[in-house]
């Protein structure tokens, strides 16, 4: 998973 994008 992409945590940087989930943080949006």
Curated annotation (Swiss-Prot):
Entry keyword annotation includes RNA-binding: no
Annotated positions of the Arginine amide modification: 8
Major site of localization recorded for this protein: secreted
Subcellular localization, as worded in the UniProt entry: Secreted
Gene Ontology biological process terms in this record: neuropeptide signaling pathway
Its biological purpose: FMRFamides and FMRFamide-like peptides are neuropeptides.
Protein's recorded name: Extended FMRFamide-2
């Amino acid at each position: 998973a992409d945590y940087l994008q989930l943080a949006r």
